[in-house]
From Swiss-Prot:
This is Glutathione gamma-glutamylcysteinyltransferase. Signal peptide: none annotated. Induction: Induced by zinc oxide nanoparticles in intestinal cells. However, not induced by zinc or cadmium. It is an enzyme of class 2 (transferase). The keyword Transcription regulation does not apply. PROSITE patterns: PCS. Belongs to the phytochelatin synthase family. Involved in the synthesis of phytochelatins, which are heavy metal binding proteins required for the detoxification of heavy metals such as cadmium, arsenic and copper.
């Protein structure tokens, strides 16, 4: 006689197979959903759908809606990351979006609208953020942006919204918008949490309300992000900021504040001493954050080795490295990555005499660089500027003339030299 085995299922383990859509949403695969899509397609208001559908993905982690949405958009817009995902393929994956916010933090808490935009900019996308509000003007602008996006094949509109306003479970969520049905004023949401909800149509006014929900982490409304590839660019292939540098990195924020305060001080009378002082101060602030993208270690960069570039990038890497090392900045720094960071620094004209001097020298070199090196500097400037603007605590570069009495050292108080010189190891 056979024995029957009894298996017990834990009563504490709660799990779900998807969620039913609320009445506010129309399932994409329903008869009505198909009808709405067909009519939108005939009117040319679903062009971007095909690019998005070809890269439609399910978020890898419960809190990865923002990352997965961005990966979907990057691949849909055919952005070459010029990084290998799985050999030999170059393709965007969530694990490759390792700037702005630590991946471990995102896995736990997700990202907000500002962080999403930061990641987009660091990956060569034009990113325009519109925070939600309930005004008719916002709804009109929303509709215009949506129509422009869905009728194109190179612009994507992403919504950061509150699910609960749509009658769904959960709160903050990201997903791209793929089609618009004009007669019913409904938009197709390509929900990246496909394990929870399928793609669905929703009234534009309803989604507008969901965009107005305040994100508790930023105290700002959610909203929209218009994304488009910056044409004629390539990603950073030689230099960059280390992966741990992100908008929550207080060390980086502190370094930026210290550097900005240094720039406010009076320059030294001797030009060579002033140049050396500025370079040493910058190195003190940012050498720990600078990285040569082709090297595994700081020592390798010091040895001027570019052997780890991929074959198709090798010549470009060598050219960029060579041009940076021919500058006066590289004569001071042991790492060309720090020199590149200084040359690419987003100096604001008129910020201070010291800032203008060092900024003008950096600009002189940039004007002499090849197209490859200039692209590298422009991309690095974008990365730096984006991280500065998003840093917590906020790092604000005030381009207006600062209050000299509160922020600036006075020569007559410290002999004939800038007080900040005492803080820099020459």
């Amino acid at each position: 006689m056979s024995q029957r085995r009894h298996f017990k299922m834990s009563v504490t383990a709660k799990n779900f197979y998807r969620r039913p859509l609320p009445e506010t949403c129309i399932e994409f695969s329903s008869e009505l959903g198909k009808k709405l899509f067909t009519e939108a397609l005939v009117r040319g208001s679903a062009n971007i759908y095909f690019k998005l559908a070809s890269q439609f993905r399910t978020q890898d982690e419960p809190a990865y809606c923002g990352l997965s949405t961005l990966v979907m958009v990057l691949n849909a817009l055919e952005v070459d990351p010029e990084k290998v995902w799985k050999a030999p393929w170059r393709f965007y994956h969530e694990s490759m979006l390792d700037c702005c916010v630590p991946l471990e933090n995102i896995r736990k808490s997700g990202i907000n609208l500002q962080q999403f935009s930061c990641l987009a900019k660091c990956n060569r996308l034009k990113s325009t953020v519109s925070y939600g509000d309930n005004s008719p003007d916002f709804l009109k602008k929303f509709r215009t942006s949506l129509v422009n996006s869905v009728r194109s094949d190179d612009q994507v509109l992403v919504a950061s919204y509150d699910r609960s306003v749509l009658g769904q479970t959960g709160s903050g969520h990201f997903s791209p918008l793929a089609a618009y049905h004009e007669d019913s004023d409904q938009v197709l949401i390509m929900d990246v949490a496909r394990f929870k909800y399928p793609p669905h149509w929703v009234k534009l006014e309803t989604l507008q309300k969901a965009l107005c929900s305040v994100d508790v982490t930023t105290k700002l409304p959610r909203g929209l992000v218009e994304l488009e590839l910056k044409k004629g660019t390539r990603p950073l292939i030689m230099y960059g900021l280390k992966a741990y540098v992100n908008i929550n990195d207080s060390d980086f924020a502190t370094s930026v504040i210290s550097w900005n305060q240094f720039l406010l001080c009076d320059p030294l009378e001797d030009d060579e001493e002033e140049f050396q002082l500025c370079c040493r101060k910058f190195g003190q602030c940012f050498a720990p954050h600078a990285m040569c993208c082709t090297q595994k270690t700081f020592d390798a960069d010091q040895k001027n080795s570019c052997t780890e570039c991929s074959t198709d990038q090798n010549e470009a890497c060598k050219m960029i490295c060579s041009e940076i090392r021919r500058t006066r900045f590289a004569e001071v720094f042991s790492s060309s990555a720090v020199a590149a960071l200084l040359i690419a620094w987003p100096f604001e004209k008129g910020y201070s005499e010291r800032s203008d001097r060092i900024g003008n020298l950096a600009e002189k070199y940039k004007n002499e660089f090849s197209a490859e090196t200039m692209n590298e500097m422009n991309q690095l400037t974008t990365q730096i500027r984006t991280l500065i603007s998003c840093s917590k605590p906020p790092v604000v570069i005030n381009i207006n003339k600062p209050d000299a009495t509160s922020n600036k050292c006075c020569k007559n108080k410290i002999g004939q030299s800038c007080a900040c010189a005492n803080d820099v190891n020459l």
